[in-house]
Regions:
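Non-catalytic beta/alpha edge segments that cap or flank active sites
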Residues: 1-78
Length: 78
């Protein structure tokens, strides 16, 4: 079964969203979450990757993440 991926480009520093990311992993312990700070990038500060083999689980985790972050913190979701 392939690993599915969602990418979230965030306009906040990693340290500013660390509590939300930790809470997300507590709620979705099977989620593979990557956090990649982007220095010098003007449109976003952190690229988050969410990975799972279960499409429903991945979508629920993505929805939970988006619900935890202020809407103006999200640059885009792919």
């Amino acid at each position: 079964m392939p690993v599915l991926l969602k990418r979230v480009f965030v306009k906040r520093r990693e340290s500013d969203i660390a509590a939300e990311l930790n809470a997300l992993l507590e709620q979705y312990p099977e989620l593979m979450l990557g956090s990649y700070p982007k220095i010098g990038e003007e449109s976003f500060h952190v690229l988050l990757t969410l990975e799972s083999r279960d499409a429903g689980y991945l979508q629920r985790a993505l929805d939970a993440l988006l619900g935890r972050l202020p809407s103006d913190a999200i640059h885009k979701v792919e």
